[in-house]
Each structure stands twice: as structure tokens, then as C-alpha cells.
């Protein structure tokens, strides 16, 4: 049995299947975990969702920002962008089934055997493990509740940018979502920044990648994340793995065998 973790799919279903063939993935013995952003920008988001949802494929995922945005469009909060290439999903007969399955997926996972932490964008530099786990479960309960659409309507904001234990309501929920699904850079005082999308070497000196800030959790646990394609799999910490390598942008899809730490890649098919 092998445990695999794969970076952001963004609707790249053909490359997804090619990579599974390359590693001889067997769902009867192996398990596959995904960093989220299953959908948007690529041509085959619907096929990706259906394949991942099918229990016989033994695949689990965390939610990414594009997955959350899809939920917001499905409930009518946002309009579909043509660049997201989601038209087939909106006319699919199983649209509602996929919608309700998606909103029941976790924001963060601690693997039951290997103990690694899996998340889409990152873990707040202000959280210990207990806070990370409790915040994930708290936000997931809202997504799985009957009034989840009311909360989705309020997620499109960059504030608050700093964690406080006494945050409540929408502000608390929004910080949790932004940390798990949108974070890249932070200030030295651990405030989150959402304006900079430059490569690390071109970013202002006042900003640092979240994983380079001081947080004991970053030293004690293996963390796997996606979201940040411009890192191209490179981080400053040997125990923190960046798995989004920009397949949808013409680069490649990446998967790691956790037991052996072997990396496999599938180039974008033109």
C-alpha cells in the first residue's frame, strides 16, 4: 500500500489520469490525497469532480479557494467567469449532488497514520496544532450547515488579516478560510497579505512566505500544501512540501509517494 499526495488539478483531468497510470495507482491498495483546487481554469473540472467523488477510487481532498468559489457560483452568489471553464458543470444532471459532496470536504487534514498535515494554502503562523484542528472543524461545520450560502456570501474580503482568539462570527470564519485557502505572504507581525502574488525573490522585503515565519508547528510536523504554483515545488524547509506546480499554466502535475518520498510528474499535454 502506498500513500500519495497530489497538487492542484484545476480541471486537468487527462494529465491526472496519465499520472495515475504512471504510478500504477491501485485504489484497492493505495490511497490518494489532494491539495484542493480540483476545479477551474482547466477544461475538465466536471470529470475531475466525478472521479474524485467516486468512492471506488479511494481519493480524498481538502478544499481550495477555487472550490469554495465554485460553491458560491453554484448557489448564485457569484457569476461564472468564462475563464474558469465551468459551463459543463452547471448543466450537469448531478450538479446538486456534486455541490453537496464538495461542501462536505475538509479544509485541513491530519493523516491518521503518517501524521502529516494537508492543507490547500497553508497554516496560520499564529496557530498551534490544537487551534489549527479546531478552526478547521469550526469552519467545516458552517460549510456543512443549512445556512452555508449566507456565509459564502461574506467570504470575499481580506479582513481581518490578523488572528485573535476572541474573533467571532463572519470575521472569525473569514480569517480561517483565508488562512487555509488563500494565504501566501505575511508581514513580520504575522498579518496576512493578499495583495502580493509575485515570486518570492521579487516580493517586497516587508513580506515573507508564511512558512518562513516563526511557528513551532512548522518545525514539528510535515506540512503539504498547494495553491502557490510559482514556488514550483521549492520551499525553504525540508518538512514542508509545495505540490502545486502549475499544470494548468503549462507546467506539470506533481505527486509524491509519502513512504518513499519519490516525486512523479506529468507534463501538461498540449
Swiss-Prot record:
Keyword annotations of the record: Hydrolase
Substrates-to-products reaction catalysed: P(1),P(4)-bis(5'-adenosyl) tetraphosphate + H2O = 2 ADP + 2 H(+)
EC number: 3.6.1.41
A GO term, aspect molecular function: bis(5'-nucleosyl)-tetraphosphatase (symmetrical) activity
CDD domains, per the entry: MPP_ApaH
Enzyme class: hydrolase
Disulfide bond positions: none
Superkingdom of the organism of origin: Bacteria
A Pfam family it matches: Metallophos
Family membership: Belongs to the Ap4A hydrolase family.
Role according to the record: Hydrolyzes diadenosine 5',5'''-P1,P4-tetraphosphate to yield ADP.
NCBIfam families registered for this protein in UniProt: apaH, PRK00166.1
Name this protein carries in UniProt: Bis(5'-nucleosyl)-tetraphosphatase, symmetrical
Taxonomic classification: Bacteria, Pseudomonadati, Pseudomonadota, Gammaproteobacteria, Pasteurellales
Gene: apaH
Amino acid at each position: 500500500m502506498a500513500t500519495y499526495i497530489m497538487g492542484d488539478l484545476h480541471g486537468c483531468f487527462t494529465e491526472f489520469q496519465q499520472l495515475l497510470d504512471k504510478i500504477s495507482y491501485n485504489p484497492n491498495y493505495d490511497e490518494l490525497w489532494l491539495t484542493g483546487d480540483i476545479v477551474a481554469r482547466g477544461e475538465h473540472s466536471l470529470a475531475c469532480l466525478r472521479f474524485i467523488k467516486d468512492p471506488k477510487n479511494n481519493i480524498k481532498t481538502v478544499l481550495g479557494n477555487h472550490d469554495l468559489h465554485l460553491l458560491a457560483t453554484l448557489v448564485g452568489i457569484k457569476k461564472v467567469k468564462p475563464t474558469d471553464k465551468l459551463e459543463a458543470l452547471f448543466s450537469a444532471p448531478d450538479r446538486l449532488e456534486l455541490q453537496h459532496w464538495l461542501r462536505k470536504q475538509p479544509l485541513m487534514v491530519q493523516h491518521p497514520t503518517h501524521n502529516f498535515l494537508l492543507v490547500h494554502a497553508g497554516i496560520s503562523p499564529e496557530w498551534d496544532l490544537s487551534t489549527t484542528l479546531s478552526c478547521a472543524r469550526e469552519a467545516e461545520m458552517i460549510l456543512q450547515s443549512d445556512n452555508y450560502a449566507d456565509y459564502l456570501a461574506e467570504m470575499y474580503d481580506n479582513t481581518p488579516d490578523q488572528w485573535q482568539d476572541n474573533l467571532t462570527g463572519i470575521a472569525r470564519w473569514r480569517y480561517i478560510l483565508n488562512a487555509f485557502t488563500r494565504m501566501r505572504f505575511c508581514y513580520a507581525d504575522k498579518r496576512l497579505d493578499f495583495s502580493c502574488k509575485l515570486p518570492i525573490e521579487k516580493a517586497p522585503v516587508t513580506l515573507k512566505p508564511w512558512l518562513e515565519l516563526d511557528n513551532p508547528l512548522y518545525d514539528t510536523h510535515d506540512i503539504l500544501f498547494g495553491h502557490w504554483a510559482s514556488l514550483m515545488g521549492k520551499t525553504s524547509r525540508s518538512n514542508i512540501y509545495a505540490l502545486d506546480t502549475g499544470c494548468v499554466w503549462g507546467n506539470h502535475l506533481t505527486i509524491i509517494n509519502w513512504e518513499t518520498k519519490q516525486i512523479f510528474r506529468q507534463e501538461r499535454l498540449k
